[in-house]
């Protein structure tokens, strides 16, 4: 059987692409080296932030607004919502470049973002402590996503729509010819007119020339009481320290508050190098500078996990066809801020398989930018 689209890597982007392409009437084969959702990539750990006024640049705003609409639609397929509208407050020095981008995005796209000085911040959320020169940009319409529930939902919906799924079967080789794309797996060879490579952190095992650097990252859950929960209207957050370190976190659930450090981490080259949480001496204490200064009421570390970022050189996404192979789309280099975009990236992949022109300007995400 020849498929219209083979998906190599069915984590966040691949799971979304499988659903949207199958729903559009295509014959799709989803593959993954493991059984998604799993612990080997970048999507585990229960939750991920979604922000609309985007500190990483205005070019992402049209994508994330479309993603939000798709998240809202996906949530209708579950009793438990995938998107939780907790609001997100971005904390940092008043002269922060990240916050300037947030404000600029909000103004350009007329997003609902409220600026709070340090006094107003600490009045609204007494649990938060910040220096006098800090501000907060609060986006009430943002929040967080239940990442593993999202992937489970996409996989179920795709399967119910007739999508073929081949999991626990790594792809060892990809071959291109005039008839399309052939992949080799432990279960045999499969053929399609087009392919999506969304293999995340380990994409270089299949396409070594891609400029992607795997980085080991950790996040952890700390003891927190009901003051830090959504029931008390405590928001999700990002926080920039005076030295430039960037943190992110979520409202407490079941008396546990999850937090991670966005920058830093350990460069790795192979999956076996991603040691579990606490294997690196600094893991348990990584969030202490933020907690001690900004959330001093949070208790000790309860448990944690390790994941992997697939960083591009400029930490912007890579969304492009492989050079010389216009029938193969690669989406990678999401650099630790990609999950929120998964549905729109999956939709872009489905449109690629359908031969449709993208609805967005993807020029900033082309591979050619690295050779200029």
Swiss-Prot record:
Gene3D superfamilies in the record: D-Amino Acid Oxidase, subunit A, domain 2 (3.30.9.10), FAD/NAD(P)-binding domain (3.50.50.60)
Tree of life domain: Bacteria
Residues bearing PTM S-8alpha-FAD cysteine: 307
Main enzyme class: oxidoreductase
Family assignment from sequence similarity: Belongs to the MSOX/MTOX family. MTOX subfamily.
Protein's job: Catalyzes the oxidative demethylation of N-methyl-L-tryptophan.
UniProt name for this protein: N-methyl-L-tryptophan oxidase
Taxonomy of the source species: Bacteria, Pseudomonadati, Pseudomonadota, Gammaproteobacteria, Enterobacterales
């Amino acid at each position: 059987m020849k498929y219209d689209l083979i998906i190599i890597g069915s984590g966040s982007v691949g799971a979304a692409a499988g659903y949207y392409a199958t729903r559009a009437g295509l014959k799709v084969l989803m593959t993954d080296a493991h059984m998604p959702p799993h612990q080997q990539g970048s999507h585990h750990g229960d939750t991920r932030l979604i922000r609309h006024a985007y500190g990483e640049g205005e070019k992402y705003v049209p994508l994330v607004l479309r993603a939000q609409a798709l998240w809202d639609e996906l949530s209708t397929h579950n009793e438990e919502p995938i998107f939780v509208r907790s609001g997100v407050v971005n904390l940092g020095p008043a002269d922060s470049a990240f916050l300037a981008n947030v404000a600029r995005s909000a103004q350009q796209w007329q997003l609902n973002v409220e600026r709070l000085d340090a006094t107003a911040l600490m009045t609204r959320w007494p649990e938060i402590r910040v220096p006098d020169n800090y501000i907060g940009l609060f986006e009430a319409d943002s929040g967080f996503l239940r990442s593993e529930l999202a992937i489970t939902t996409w996989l179920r919906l795709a399967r119910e729509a007739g999508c073929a799924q081949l999991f626990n079967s790594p792809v060892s080789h990809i071959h291109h010819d005039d008839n399309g794309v052939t992949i080799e797996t432990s279960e045999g060879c499969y053929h399609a007119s087009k392919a999506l490579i969304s293999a995340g952190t380990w994409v270089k095992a299949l396409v070594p020339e891609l400029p992607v650097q795997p980085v080991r990252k950790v996040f952890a859950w700390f003891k927190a009481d009901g003051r830090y929960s959504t029931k008390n209207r405590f928001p999700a957050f990002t926080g920039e320290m005076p030295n430039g370190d960037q943190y992110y976190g979520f409202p407490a659930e079941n008396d546990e508050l999850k937090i991670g450090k966005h920058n830093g981490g350990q460069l790795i080259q192979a999956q076996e190098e991603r040691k579990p949480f606490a294997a690196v001496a600094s893991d348990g204490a990584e969030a202490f500078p933020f907690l001690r200064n900004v959330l001093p009421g949070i208790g000790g570390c309860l448990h944690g996990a390790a994941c992997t970022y697939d960083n591009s050189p400029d930490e912007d996404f890579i969304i492009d066809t492989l050079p010389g192979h216009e029938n193969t789309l690669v989406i990678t280099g999401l650099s630790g801020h990609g999950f929120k975009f998964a549905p729109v990236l999956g939709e872009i992949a489905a449109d690629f398989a359908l031969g449709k022109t993208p609805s967005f300007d993807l020029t900033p995400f082309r591979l050619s930018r690295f050779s200029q």
